[in-house]
Every structure is written in C-alpha cells, then in structure tokens.
Amino acid sequence: IPPEVDGKPWDSYPTEQIARDLRFFKYEPGAKWHGFEDYGPDQYFVDPCKFLLTTPGINIERGEYEPFGVPAGILAEYLRENGIVPEKADLNSILFLMTPAEDLAKMENLVNRIAHFERLLDANAPLSEVLPVLYRNHAERYRDYTIRDLCQELHDYYREYDLKSIQKAMFRKDELP
C-alpha cells in the first residue's frame, strides 16, 4: 500500500474512510514503494483481498540486490511445514489470499508463524530445526546448515544470475513469442 495518501500517513486515516476510498489502494506511476513500471494513472489498484509480503534481499528503490536476502520460497516452505499454504511465492515475494471467511485466529497464526520464522532467522537456527522435513529428505546435502546458510546460498544464486531481471523480462511483451 502507498505509505502516504494526500501527504498524510496511510494508517492515520479512519478505517471506514480507507475501506470506501480507492485512493488508498492506487498504484501511482513512478512511485518507488511498489517497483512496478510502464502503466498509466488509475490503471491498477492494490487488491485488499491479497496479502503480499516482500522478503528481504532487494532494495526496491534502487532495484539492486542487497548482500543478504531471504528467498520467499524458503519462507513458503517453512509455512507449509507448519500447516500454512501460501497462494504462491516467487523470488522475493509471497502471496496469501484473504477471503471473507478468514477469522482472526487464522490471521494471528499466520502472523505468529512469520514472526517465529524471523526469530529463527535472527538466531541463525539449524536448518534441521527450521525446515525439518526438507532437512530429513536431504540430510546429507544440508548437514550442518543453518537457516541463514540456506538463505544466503539461494540469494547468492539469484544475485549471480540476476534472476529478478530474467523474471521481469519473462513478462514483458517484447519477450513473448
């Protein structure tokens, strides 16, 4: 969501106003908070039924890889191993679809699991603790790995091959057959 609307912080507005006013969900051309390009004013809006998280690893304003990152696929695997199935994950974003049937307990579970993953990442927990199923299935490959080791290895691969640029090109009209 845009950090500001009409020069005021997004979250300073009353919920009722946000719920009824599309200005709070606009993708403004050229804005740095979303990283999208090549579209016109009022062409796209944030879908309030989609919860998209961007994982660390890419500086959105500069479009450059940072030294360390958390590939979204790793967070997605952690969530799946803990009974939460994201709609999709790509290089550095993970999407959840929210329906009117979602209850507070389900949302709190999602937030708590993401916060727990962050604590495990900060503690550089052993991979066997963070992703036990993945570890068990590939114990020899991941012996002595920590969660940060796995994140760094995959992030370095993304950075070495500039996968974000390849992914972006895949969806450009000029690249289509």
Predicted features along the sequence, with ranges:
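Non-catalytic terminal extensions of PLP-dependent enzymes
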Residues: 1-177
